[in-house]
Design a protein with these regions (language model features):
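Secondary-structure boundary/capping micro-motif
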Residues: 2-279, 284-374
Length: 374
């Protein structure tokens, strides 16, 4: 084989290489070409260090060309602790970002249950996993004590950050191109405050004649907090209800019910780690805990609450006169069940019996607590 043939074979072998294949079984792994783009753009952003002149809450917006969704992009690093570009996609993620930026109490479970997007974080070798190091070494990164390098992650509601698929990586490539163009523009224009007006942000639009995505037009757009989507009552699982109705159980007392995600991880070594999700019910008078209902990230909140309540009624041998919940959303989700069985649902700020159980459970599973405590 000639040298040119050998070089060509080596190049083809590289091009066919994939990253994160074991960790993304059943999904499209990261291609060599896209991984190379991520690495080069990530290293460029690390050199620019945008956190030196951008605050964590200085969002810029872009539109995903495939889905049409808005990407809300934020650089982190002004505090000198975490250095990253975070890209939040969709209205729910944006709404939750604003909640964090406003300093409202936010648990780890709340964060992971709501956020969807992609990120590049710049970490030292101690924080890099073997799959991360495999990618970095493939593009010539030399490991050095204390030296930071980019790692690439995706956030999906109900899951911990995990390795990016090919599709998720392309969104991140696009947003990296956008912030690098924005940084070049900011360096040329000097001290311009794009965020001086409330709810107004720079929106980056690729110039039509530029196929490289290196040049963007900057438009200022108003992006107020989107309204919360109205919940709808869940369809009833008649097979579960039939186990309650014919028994003519006595009606008495109150039950306290809640649903939440925790920061505890569930999953095998090379699996995307789900957050432990649970619906809990306790007797509002005695504080007795009933069997909790565990759920997957994709499960319906209303169904989890309904199953937990029906299980409590079966085990407790009574139908409550009242069910107390913390959120108006839960009252709506349970409206069909409450009408069918005949109990009231009341929204209250405090669930003393259940909160005691919840705090004990979170401590037992090692939940990290509120984001401000991390």
């Amino acid at each position: 084989m000639s040298n040119s043939e050998s070089d060509g074979a080596a190049a083809r072998a590289k091009e066919s290489r994939r990253f994160f294949e074991k960790q993304l079984a059943g999904e499209q792994p990261l291609s060599f070409e896209t991984a190379g783009q991520l690495f080069r753009l990530g290293m460029q952003l690390l050199a620019v260090q945008p956190w030196e002149f951008l605050e964590d809450q200085d969002l810029f917006l872009m539109q995903d060309g495939e889905s049409g969704e808005i990407c809300y992009c934020s650089t982190m690093g002004a505090l000198g602790e975490v250095f990253s570009l975070q890209v939040y996609t969709g209205a729910e993620s944006y709404r939750f970002f604003r909640r964090i930026a406003a300093g409202k109490p936010t648990s780890a479970g709340d964060f992971y249950s709501s956020m969807r997007g992609v990120s590049v974080e710049f970490v030292t070798a101690r924080e890099q996993t073997p799959p991360d190091r495999e990618l970095l070494e493939a593009f010539g990164h030399l490991k050095k004590r204390g030296k930071r390098a980019p790692i690439f992650r995706a956030l999906r509601p109900g899951y911990h950050p995990w390795y990016v698929t090919e599709g998720e990586a392309k969104i991140l490539v696009y947003c990296l191109q956008g912030i690098l163009a924005f940084c070049r523009h900011a360096a040329e224009m000097g001290d311009i405050d794009y965020w001086e007006k409330e709810d107004v942000f720079p929106f980056l639009v690729p110039k039509a004649e530029d196929k490289t995505h290196e040049h963007f037009e900057i438009r200022l757009v108003k992006a107020p907090e989107p309204p919360v989507a109205a919940p709808r009552a869940e369809e009833l699982d008649e097979s579960l209800i039939s186990g309650i109705l014919p028994e003519y159980l006595p009606k008495r007392g109150a039950l306290e019910a809640d649903h939440f995600f925790t920061g505890a991880k569930i999953g095998e070594q090379n699996e995307r780690k789900a957050c432990l999700r649970i619906a809990m019910v306790s007797d509002g008078d005695s504080g007795v805990a009933f069997q909790p209902e565990l759920g997957k990230p994709e499960d319906s909140t209303g169904q989890l609450l309904a199953r937990a309540l029906l299980g409590a009624m079966r085990d407790g041998r009574f139908v409550p006169s009242e069910v107390r919940v913390r959120h108006k959303e839960f009252k709506i989700l349970l409206s069909g069940l409450s009408e069918k069985i005949g109990f009231g649902v009341r929204v209250t700020k405090s669930l003393p019996a259940l909160d005691h159980l919840k705090d004990h459970f979170l401590a037992m599973v090692g939940d990290p607590g509120e984001i401000s405590d991390w």
